[in-house]
Design a protein with these regions (language model features):
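Outer-membrane beta-barrel initiation region
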Residues: 1-47, 101-105, 112-124
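Solvent-exposed loop/turn segments connecting transmembrane beta-strands
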Residues: 1, 19-31, 53-63, 101, ...
């Protein structure tokens, strides 16, 4: 099954609520829920929260939570400082060098720029998101300091009124002294 719901500005305060659930024949289950509340008390400050759950068949499950406090330069430019944590469970309890139970925590900083146009189907013409985090991973094997960088860029090239080329780039870098398979960044498929 598949569910992809996005509610934008339903309370007329600029809030965004997203809900995404996907379960496919490959025994993967993805659940993402997020809420963003901008301009709290009519100030340029806002908050957002995310919950991401990913289950890979009977191998492992990752649960990531994030809470960010943001400053809105304007509707197109935002800066967030936040806290992100992930808890991963090795469902088979093998706890070897490839897959293991772990918890990580990061202090994060995110800059977002989005350029919107008046197009009902594709209102987001340009998007640039840069996110970095500094923290540590604790597993049964060891504790490691970690740093990550994430860059997402997309742009729509309008050839004419009826034809658009959508360019999209997702980049992720994780610096660690060693890596566990269930902590690696996953992307791809029809949504990429």
């Amino acid at each position: 099954g598949n569910l992809d719901l996005s509610l934008i500005n339903i309370l007329n305060t600029g809030e965004v609520f997203n809900l995404y659930w996907k379960s496919d024949n490959n025994k993967q289950v993805t659940f993402n829920a997020s809420i963003e509340l901008p301009y709290i008390f009519k100030s340029p400050l806002g908050v957002r929260a995310n919950l991401n759950i990913f289950k890979q068949d009977s191998t492992f499950q990752n649960t990531k939570t994030a809470l960010d406090l943001g400053y809105y330069f304007n509707y197109n430019k935002k800066l967030f400082l936040g806290y992100q944590s992930t808890e991963s469970s090795d469902i088979q309890n093998t706890n070897n060098a490839l897959i293991a139970d772990f918890e990580n925590t990061f202090l994060t900083a995110t800059f977002e720029y989005k350029n919107y146009i008046e197009e009902p189907l594709f209102p987001e013409k340009t998007k640039f998101i840069f996110k970095t985090g500094f923290g540590e991973r604790i597993s049964k094997l060891e504790t490691n300091s970690q740093t990550f960088f994430e860059i997402n860029i997309s742009h729509d090239l309008y050839l004419n009124k009826n034809n658009v080329i959508h360019l999209n780039s997702q980049n992720y870098y994780l610096k660690s002294s060693n890596y566990i398979t269930n902590e690696l960044f996953r992307f791809g498929g029809i949504q990429s």
